[in-house]
């Protein structure tokens, strides 16, 4: 038979360094050449960008990356011989069997649970899934075995086609491994880039014994177990031999997942933060969660803040995670302080950075100083504030009863959907210095292909600008490439916030829009408890100064059954309006009083215990805004 070739990409490929090793293979099955093609594409991408891309440079300098582009050269060449223009359907190698048939399925010839039953492989030589006369009977798989035991990989990717899935053990039984959470977490992250489904091979496709993934994970004697995956590239229409115009697209789909796979095999952590956009104290914190995904043990990760605004006077010390456990979420925070000269509505920017000895990743956080007040709230119990011929209320899924608003109130969204919902009201931000759109959301769409966007328009809907929130992500869909979208699956309500400060000084409308393709239809997007909060330009004092210039004395605070409000200074307004909101901007109580009254009494008996905000308006001007605690 023909030789198998392997390639090593590293900063010193001729040396065996004490670095993490990852293996990519392809073409176990001769009619699945897209696996080899994407591998060659990725190898060229690494080499061509080594000198110009610091991330790729560091990746290659700190990892030994191995490639075996063609595990089955005899079968591949046979297809080339009989179908030189592509399309050959030979699957196995070219062993001559005792019954004069040809071929062994190389992905049924590995030693772990070889021949476990006749469902996951076949004892019949003429079968497409013939496992061979014995485990490791085939020279190709013997070479793979010896190669793997020589280099001791901790992560392996065996590329196949097709079904747009990412498979992992077990294949030989319909069960999961003891370390299924690791496989599942890795697969979830890896498929963010290409929208593939994922799961154990036996549950996603069919039983398969004597396969590569099971052996790498559990069958290597005197070796560390390797987390092994099988990406199945392409959909049913693209098949084993995708058309020429599809090849580059399929190769590009795998690049980011391959990068992440290399990081998983080495050192890799992530930080997430969902801090509220508004803050009101001169001393504050940036809170975050850290999780380690990289398989390398004994690594220290550092999280730090760097001020990017002159209004930030200081930041706290970095936080170190020394030898964190794999996939355990750690919560922490770092303090920062702002100048006493900061004014309500002022924005600050802080760089949040995660680094280890190899890699650095940073995100810029934008925060707004001050206590906002809502100019619009909607509990989404009716469609009164919205215009749409498709979206509507749903009384089964909601953040707060009795309902939410969704793109498909009954069932899943349709194929080729292009639906939207627009606010009937035009929101006036002409006097706002800062503004934030807040809502609760959950969603379930086909990743990459179907998505939801939130838009703003300042010209009555003639033109729309896509808005970026804390939970949106850049799209990889060519229709809206790199635009912020909500895609994939998030089945827990999250409090989304979108900074609308770029639109202050104008009036705007808000729109939610969903688009889908012709294939998979899912439940869609829900939103609930939406509000638009602003800090007014006329608010000329900071929250800390406000306490020294109060126009009204509010007592008691915390309050029980009643709240009393007494003017501290005379004013000329004819009437006073008292409004009480919860922390999400929902209006719970509004009451008006003549300005001549010496004490205003507000009944709180019907308000549940909790944290609220009280707004006092004298005439048309908001003169006081305070936090209120109600405790029955």
Model-based region annotation:
Residues 380, 429-444, 452, 456, ...:
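Extracellular beta-strand-rich recognition modules
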Residues 80, 85-282:
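Metallocarboxypeptidase
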Residues 449-451, 516-535:
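Extracellular carbohydrate recognition
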Residues 268-280, 372-383, 415-416, 533-555, ...:
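Residue-level detector of functionally pivotal "anchor" positions at catalytic/ligand-binding pockets or at interdomain
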Residues 313-342:
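Intrinsically disordered, low-complexity Pro/Gly/Ser/Thr-rich segments with frequent PxxP/GP/PP motifs
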Residues 375-419, 468-494:
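Extracellular glycan-recognition surfaces and repeat-rich motifs
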Residues 545-555, 559-632:
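C-terminal outer-membrane/trafficking sorting elements
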